[in-house]
Structures are given as structure tokens and as C-alpha cells.
């Protein structure tokens, strides 16, 4: 209940005052036109966002007592401010003679709620296996969660004709989203086309995948062969991995994971010596990653048909651990190479209902795999790979005016995954009926879906419902966005399938005001729920969820929080 939450932490008053001042005059705000007329048209756009958030749930002791979840769970208490973040993005675009140009954008952020101190369970035993032995975050973790910046888009383009055929060329760092999927980033045609920012996804449930894409260096060409047929091709010059909240932060799903932590923490006790963490064994930047697409819209189809072929290195890592011969080891990330995808999409509109379908077949893609190969002195560089079929269907419906709302939208999407075969390293596949699927309480027994083991078939759904009320005040539109992602049946076989495991609930509910179509103010609640394993008492540590905690990132189960966001552009 909100009424019993003691709110700690305050808004930076200068930032809030500035945001309110901008809101007051935002009706006249325009992008800065640096040069227009003649051959060049150059524009500078700036977006500023302020986000505040507070933890609303009490700590679940079975999470706080878990050696792999304690640091993230003890970073903030109920009522604490978990984010107090100012972020800005600047975009510079220039167009020469309306057919040639460039785009450059960058982002900078600072979160005043975070310091660099690592916190954990006050039980003295937990201080012996910190994922940051120095007691402070690594530079990598501080960059993404305290203060940092990055270049986003950086590309040039040229539009021309070859004979009578329009040709569009682009080179540099940018994003391109193929297919029709809205929400499911691990099972869509665009999987691994670009890395996905799951830091943003966890803090903004209901975001569309294309909004979460991170740019990647590439060259791309598209041509309109006929009014009904176009073709595109892209070749990548850079590899980038999916971005997740780092271990030991509020929404970090596992204390020792990803590129931030420097120690394997409690794994040291299992491996008989110190365990390092944070290293990534990435594919080469230029590794023959490419894609081709044909878009066809014949009159008889009543819509658009897409055909796709892609070869890529998976951007979703395996979390893996090496056991050294002399004791100790290493926790790291490694990636599947040269996966292939064949896909077909179709989209069609029926009045106010827009529908989309995707069917894709992925070969030698990364599957849910064991954390360790169990072999002393043998490096673990590749988990299980296999062939999977993914089907996505969705619809976007524009709400008609009713006594309850003026307009709005409803988006619904279904994702189905079928494992066709395990192609390599079947002994490492963490799937029901395979050797690496073990019971959470007794590792001598075979495991099940409840233990996080993948199943042959899996189904998940996602919804976004946002009714709108127009002109509730001068220049103000109001909406109430609500989202839900739910794991209906089974655990997907692909790596990170646990995010959509059976029983998963990722949800948000809120209210948003749009002021003169330039500024938004949103207040929402975000929650997460995965099925947990049985509780077990660990001597010296207390009672916690057994094994890895359940069938997904259960460390987030007690991380429900209220979020206030103010965003404007000029």
C-alpha cells in the first residue's frame, strides 16, 4: 500500500524547476534550425528526461538471503529512492540538396540516487563473497548506473537512382528493425539484428523492441525495383551484446552477471578458490554478419509480405563459468557464432485493426545452457545450440470514442517457440529430459520447468492498453497506459528464455499527460513476478529459494517500484 511507504530521497530542485519552466513555454518550442535554404538544411534536436523512482515492496528474505541476489536486494530498502536520474540526448542532422546527409546523436546521464558503494546482507558471511571485492562498483557498472554517456547514431546517407530505380544507401552506426514484432525481442525476425537495451526495458515495461534497439556499425542498401517490390541488404561492421542491469544494482537479475562485477562471489566456494568475473569472449567485429530482405505488396495480398535471410552472431550471451585445474575459476560471457535465420512476415489492416504475423526458423542459435561444463581445466566457450521455430502474431486496434474514453490503442501479441533439435553440446542444454536439467533442491534428481529448465514448446503473450482523453485542459491530453507480459505455458528453449518462462508476469500501470505535444509527465507502477523454487535453509546464511531461485530472474520479485518521468524536447 502506498500509504505505508516512507519516502526517502528528494528530487533535485534545480532540475525539477528547469523541467517545469520548459513545460510552461513548451508550446513555442521548436527544433533548432541551424541552417536552412540553399543546399543545406541542418537541425539540432535536444531531449531532456528526468526520472524518479521509489521502492514500494518489502524485502523478501528468501531473496535477500540468497548468495546470488543479496547485493541487488540490499542496495535499497522499501521507500528508498531507487533512481533520481537526469538524461539528455542531442541529435544533429544535416541534409544536402534533399538527398545526401548525416545524422549524429549522443546521450548523457547521471543518477543521483546511486553512489558507488556495494551493499549486501548484514550477515557477516555475505561480506566474504561480494561480486565487487573492493566494496565499490567497477567503472563499467558506474558508467551505466551512476554517470556516463555514449554516441548513438553516427551515419551518412545518400539517395539516388540507377536508371529509373530509386536506391537508398546508408553507412555508419544506426538501427534497422525488420519484421512486425512489437514486444518479444528473443523470438522475432529481428533477433540479434541489433543489441537490445534491457536496462531501459526493465525500467519501462511495455516498451516496443524497436525502441530498445542499440545502434550498430553497418552498411545498408535498399532499392525499389517496382512499386510492389523492394529489396534491402545490410552488412555489419561491429558486434555489440545485449545490455542488462549490472549485478549488484537494484534491477540486476543476478549479482555476479554481466560485464560489471569483478568477482564470482559465492561461486568461489563451489570452485575451491577465487573466481573472477566480468570478462566477455565476443565474436570479431566483422564476422560475416549480414541480412537480406525482400518486401512485396501485390494487390491480391491486401497487405505487405516480407522475406528474410540473415546470418548473425547471437547478441544474447551465455553466462558461463570455467573451473581452473588449481582451484578457483572465472565467470564470463560467451556468444554463439554464425546462427542463421529464415523468415516470412505478413501485415494487413482491417479498418482500425492492424495485424502482423511472423514465422522464422533459426539454426545453430544459442539455447538455454548450463552455467558450467563441469570439466576442470577445460574452458567453457560454447553452450548448447539448436534449431528453433518462432511464430509471432499481433494486432494493434485504435479505440473508438466511447463514454469511457475519447480514443486510444490496444496492442496484443503472442509468441510461440518450438525446439526442433539440439545441434551441438546437448550435454549442456538446460532442457527438460537433458542431463543439465537438475532439481533445485536435490541436484541428484532430474529437474523440471519449475527449476528453470526449457521445454520443447512455449507460449507467451503481451498486451499494451492505453485509453486516451483529449484536451482535458488547455493543450493537455491524458492517457492511462497499462502493460502485461505473461508466460502462458512452457519455458522457451532459446538463451534467456527464462525472461518469458511459464507464469512470468511483468506489468505496469500508470497515467500520462502530454502537454502541447512536446512534453510528457508520467506516473506508473512497475512490477515483476517469476515462479520461485522451494525454500531451503543454508547453514550460516539463512533460508532462501533453492538453487538459482526458480524459473526466471526471481531476484526482481520484490522490486516493485513507483516511477515519475518528465520528458521534453526542443
What are these regions (language model features)?
Residues 46, 88-94, 104, 153-158, ...:
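Residues on the lipid-exposed face of transmembrane beta-strands in outer-membrane beta-barrel proteins
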Amino acid at each position: 500500500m502506498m500509504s505505508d511507504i516512507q519516502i526517502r530521497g528528494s528530487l533535485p530542485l534545480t532540475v525539477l524547476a528547469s523541467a517545469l519552466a520548459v513545460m510552461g513555454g513548451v508550446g513555442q518550442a521548436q527544433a533548432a534550425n541551424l541552417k536552412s535554404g540553399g543546399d543545406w538544411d541542418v537541425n539540432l534536436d535536444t531531449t531532456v528526461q528526468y526520472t524518479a523512482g521509489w521502492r514500494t515492496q518489502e524485502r523478501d528474505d528468501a531473496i535477500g538471503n540468497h548468495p546470488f541476489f543479496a547485493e541487488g536486494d540490499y542496495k535499497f530498502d522499501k521507500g528508498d529512492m531507487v533512481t533520481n536520474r537526469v538524461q539528455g540526448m542531442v541529435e544533429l542532422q544535416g541534409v544536402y540538396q534533399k538527398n545526401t546527409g548525416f545524422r549524429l546523436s549522443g546521450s548523457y546521464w547521471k543518477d543521483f540516487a546511486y553512489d558507488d558503494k556495494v551493499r549486501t546482507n548484514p550477515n557477516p558471511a555475505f561480506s566474504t563473497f561480494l561480486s565487487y571485492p573492493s566494496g565499490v562498483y567497477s567503472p563499467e557498472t558506474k558508467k551505466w548506473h551512476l554517470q556516463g554517456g555514449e554516441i548513438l547514431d553516427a551515419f551518412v546517407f545518400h539517395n539516388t537512382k540507377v536508371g529509373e530505380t530509386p536506391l537508398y544507401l546508408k553507412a555508419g552506426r544506426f538501427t534497422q528493425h525488420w519484421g512486425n514484432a512489437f514486444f518479444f525481442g528473443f523470438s522475432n525476425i529481428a533477433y540479434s539484428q541489433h543489441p537490445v537495451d534491457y536496462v531501459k526495458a526493465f525500467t519501462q515495461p511495455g516498451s516496443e523492441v524497436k525502441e530498445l534497439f542499440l545502434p550498430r556499425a553497418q552498411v545498408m542498401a535498399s532499392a525499389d525495383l517496382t512499386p510492389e517490390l523492394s529489396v534491402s541488404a545490410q552488412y555489419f561492421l561491429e558486434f555489440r551484446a545485449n545490455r542488462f542491469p549490472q549485478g549488484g544494482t537494484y534491477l540486476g537479475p543476478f549479482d555476479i552477471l554481466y560485464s560489471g562485477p569483478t568477482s564470482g562471489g559465492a561461486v568461489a566456494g563451489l570452485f575451491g578458490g577465487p573466481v573472477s568475473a566480468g570478462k566477455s569472449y565476443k565474436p570479431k567485429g566483422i564476422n560475416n554478419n549480414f541480412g537480406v530482405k525482400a518486401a512485396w505488396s501485390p494487390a491480391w495480398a491486401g497487405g505487405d509480405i516480407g522475406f528474410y535471410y540473415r546470418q548473425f552472431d547471437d547478441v544474447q550471451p551465455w553466462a558461463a563459468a570455467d573451473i581452473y585445474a588449481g582451484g578457483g575459476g572465472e565467470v564470463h560471457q560467451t556468444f554463439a557464432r554464425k546462427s542463421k535465420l529464415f523468415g516470412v512476415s505478413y501485415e494487413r489492416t482491417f479498418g482500425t485493426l492492424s495485424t502482423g504475423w511472423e514465422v522464422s526458423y533459426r539454426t545453430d542459435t544459442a539455447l538455454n545452457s548450463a552455467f558450467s561444463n563441469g570439466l576442470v581445466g577445460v574452458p567453457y566457450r560454447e553452450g548448447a545450440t539448436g534449431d528453433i521455430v518462432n511464430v509471432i502474431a499481433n494486432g494493434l486496434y485504435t479505440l473508438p470514442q466511447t463514454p469511457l474514453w475519447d480514443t486510444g490503442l490496444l496492442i496484443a501479441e503472442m509468441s510461440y517457440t518450438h525446439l526442433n533439435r539440439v545441434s551441438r553440446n546437448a550435454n549442456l542444454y538446460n532442457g527438460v529430459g537433458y542431463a543439465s536439467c537438475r532439481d533445485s533442491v536435490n541436484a541428484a534428481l532430474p529437474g523440471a520447468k519449475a527449476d528453470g529448465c526449457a521445454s520443447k514448446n512455449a507460449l507467451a503473450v503481451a498486451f499494451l492498453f492505453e485509453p486516451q482523453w483529449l484536451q482535458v485542459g488547455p493543450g493537455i491530453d491524458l492517457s492511462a497506459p497499462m502493460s502485461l507480459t505473461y508466460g502462458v505455458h512452457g519455458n522457451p528453449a532459446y538463451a534467456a528464455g527464462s525472461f518469458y518462462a511459464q507464469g512470468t508476469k511483468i506489468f505496469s500501470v500508470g497515467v500520462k499527460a502530454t502537454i502541447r505535444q512536446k512534453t510528457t509527465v508520467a506516473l506508473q507502477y512497475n512490477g515483476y513476478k517469476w515462479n520461485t523454487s522451494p525454500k531451503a535453509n543454508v547453514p550460516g546464511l539463512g533460508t532462501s529459494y533453492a538453487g538459482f531461485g526458480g524459473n526466471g530472474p526471481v531476484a526482481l520479485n520484490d522490486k516493485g517500484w513507483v516511477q515519475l518521468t518528465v520528458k521534453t524536447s526542443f
